[in-house]
Amino acid sequence: MRSDIVKKGFERAPHRSLLRACGLTDEDFKKPFIGIANSYIDIIPGHVHLREFAQIVKEAVREAGGVPFEFNVIGVDDGIAMGHSGMHYSLPSRELIADSIETVVEAHKLDALVCIPNCDKIVPGMIMAAARLNIPVIFVSGGPMAAGHLPDGRPIDLATAFEAVGAVSRGLMTENELRVIEENACPSCGSCSGMFTANSMNCLSEVLGIALPGNGSILATDPRRQELARKAGEQIVKLVEADLKFRDIVNEETIENAFTLDIAMGGSSNTVLHLLAIANEAGIDFPVEKIDQISRRTPTLCKLAPASQYHMEDLDRAGGISAILKELSKKGLLHLDRPTVSLKTLGEVIEDAEIKDPDVIRPIHNPYSETGGLAVLFGNIAPYGGVVKAAAVDPKIMVHRGKAVCFDSEEEAIAGITGGKVKAGDVVVIRYEGPRGGPGMREMLSPTSAIMGMGLGDKVSLITDGRFSGATRGACIGHISPEAAAGGPIGIIKDGDEILIDIPNRKIELLISEEEFKKRMENFKPKKKEIKSRWLRRYSRFVTSANKGAVLSDSCE
């Protein structure tokens, strides 16, 4: 066992003495040391209940013959950090989480790891750490919250609240009506109830093979969620005995499976960023062009909030992730022989799955569309690509030609949109919000929600080198690479320039002559902003482009 290096031999007497002070006995030194990476934190509703989850996992580990050691990692609530300077810290927190888990596990030579995440950057941060460490690992998330409901019974969620702010600013809703939404949108603990980033990543954990079935869809308040935690604690000891490590489970085919599910279920566009980062940590080269190839052959089988009235509880009732995977397997779209933490292949895991509600999960012969819910666009604005959640775009604006209205920060954009600077037919351009330029690649949920709340969702497009919340809907193209701060062409767009966005044909073009384009690029000097935070300055220096997953490079570029 890895842990023998800290518990075997007379040289380790001081180490054992310290471990005895933690309550260990001679018998414990014969057992595997299991780390429990818990992301419990009081200020994130998706994490407030994780303290008891960790206790369930620890008890199960002990009963199965392991020694559990719980430690905590930080977390950021993207909803609370949204729309102000706090969002600069969201994506960088992913790297801190990965680094901190690596630090604890390697410093103490733990044999295996149970990860208890739930919300946006915590899930990918933990998966990145697992890929880096390459030890036996299992994930059990805290689960989604239930959808909220208005007094008339209509389902709502956090995205409803953000969009309502835009409606109030335009006089389409009263503040009293907004208050009713505020008080009902988030009714319980758990990750926000739609197919937003957190739930997307927890669902993808199933197809990656690192979580047990149900991890993505069973509600946080469902007793089955606690049973899932207990099973995870038992299973991690079996994984140690089987010596099944992360990279034995996750390879290039597994990443392909993940993108296939992601595209079929209409996952958050942030998943592209995170899956690329996970692939990078696992030593897998996965170009963004390959994502679009997968999207073109993968049908859209689900449309959950923000693309419809359905939420995670509906997905769970309809058969969960296993039912979606079973449908995809009928078309030969998955690598079914990949191993999983259940010690079964993916094909064996989903063998008995079936759709229980074809309105929530469409059968493979009757998809929403024959192509996927995520698309990667290329063109002179985005030579390295841009990502759009096509499943959440109104059909009326899948192809849009409009005049640019440019902003150099999210704050400028919010002021301009709510101040009436943006009109029907425009293309909003928000730049200097990329990984390096932001820094931190902030989510543009407030600007997009303002557009939707003002009734312009089928009349205005938005492009940015930043990213979007999983709650975003509309013609919103993010992750434009290279970013403006790195000299990307998005930085040369001027107010009034015509832009063509053609999602079906995967194009995004600045409609100026080649000569004018070349001239602007030659004269372009990216803006530099003062970054007061020492951490964010370091992050800005070392972070890579969105098409590489916005991971930190080994050297300053």
Swiss-Prot record:
Catalytic residues in the record: 469
Function: Functions in the biosynthesis of branched-chain amino acids. Catalyzes the dehydration of (2R,3R)-2,3-dihydroxy-3-methylpentanoate (2,3-dihydroxy-3-methylvalerate) into 2-oxo-3-methylpentanoate (2-oxo-3-methylvalerate) and of (2R)-2,3-dihydroxy-3-methylbutanoate (2,3-dihydroxyisovalerate) into 2-oxo-3-methylbutanoate (2-oxoisovalerate), the penultimate precursor to L-isoleucine and L-valine, respectively.
SUPFAM superfamilies registered for this protein in UniProt: IlvD/EDD N-terminal domain-like, LeuD/IlvD-like
EC number: 4.2.1.9
Keyword terms, alphabetized: 2Fe-2S, Amino-acid biosynthesis, Branched-chain amino acid biosynthesis, Iron, Iron-sulfur, Lyase, Magnesium, Metal-binding
Cofactor(s) recorded in Swiss-Prot or TrEMBL: [2Fe-2S] cluster; Mg(2+)
Gene Ontology terms for molecular function: 2 iron, 2 sulfur cluster binding; dihydroxy-acid dehydratase activity; magnesium ion binding
NCBIfam families xrefs: ilvD, PRK00911.1
Designated name of the protein: Dihydroxy-acid dehydratase
Lineage: superkingdom: Bacteria
Single GO biological process annotation from the record: isoleucine biosynthetic process
Matching InterPro entries: Dihydro-acid_dehy_C, DihydroxyA_deHydtase, DiOHA_6PGluconate_deHydtase_CS, ILV_EDD_C, ILV_EDD_N, IlvD/EDD_N
Pfam families with a match to the protein in the record: ILV_EDD_C (PF24877), ILVD_EDD_N (PF00920)
Catalysed reactions listed for this entry: (2R)-2,3-dihydroxy-3-methylbutanoate = 3-methyl-2-oxobutanoate + H2O; (2R,3R)-2,3-dihydroxy-3-methylpentanoate = (S)-3-methyl-2-oxopentanoate + H2O
Organism field: Persephonella marina (strain DSM 14350 / EX-H1)
